[in-house]
A protein has these predicted regions:
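Charge-rich, low-complexity N-terminal segments
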Residues: 1-28
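Contiguous hydrophobic segments
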Residues: 3-6, 14, 31-33, 52-59, ...
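Generic structural motif recognizing short loop/turn segments at the entrances and edges of beta-strands
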Residues: 2, 7-12, 35-40, 53-59, ...
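Intrinsically disordered, low-complexity regulatory regions enriched in serine/threonine/proline
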Residues: 9-10, 65-127
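Ser/Thr-rich, low-complexity intrinsically disordered terminal regions
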Residues: 18-20, 26-65, 85
Length: 127
């Protein structure tokens, strides 16, 4: 994670965003309720076990329509702050909640790349 160049929103500069047609963006799951950007948000699903109760983590991508830097955020909705699963896994590679988050974030990244909105991300690299 060290020495990764990031954009002004903290996203690895190797990752690029491409805005597709309005119809395609909506089909993929983006909204543009805020007229100046496309927004994608998906909740991370945890097992229905007591030890995971209370986790409310989301994966978010915000792409400004003016071409300025986009953001990719994993947020802890309970504490209204970033959930830095990558840093936590760097310190404890077996921390189960972060492994769950990582797997689903990577699935959403692959989905967005497969659909042509994002490019340049390789599995496991810093986002």
């Amino acid at each position: 994670m060290n020495n990764i160049e990031v954009n002004s929103k903290g996203v690895n500069i190797a990752i690029k965003a491409q805005i597709l047609s309005d119809e395609k963006m909506r089909e993929i799951g983006f909204t543009d309720y805020s007229n100046d950007r496309w927004y994608f948000c998906k909740g991370i699903e945890f097992p229905k076990e007591k030890r995971y109760s209370g986790f409310d983590i989301t994966f978010n991508v915000s792409i400004p329509k003016d071409g300025s830097d986009f953001s990719i955020d994993v947020l802890d909705e309970d504490f209204l702050q970033p959930y830095d699963y990558q840093r936590m896994l760097n310190e404890n590679p077996n921390f189960e909640p972060c492994l769950i988050v990582k797997e689903q974030v990577e699935e959403w990244m692959a989905y967005l790349q497969d659909n042509g909105v994002l490019s340049g991300h390789n599995y496991g690299e810093y986002i």
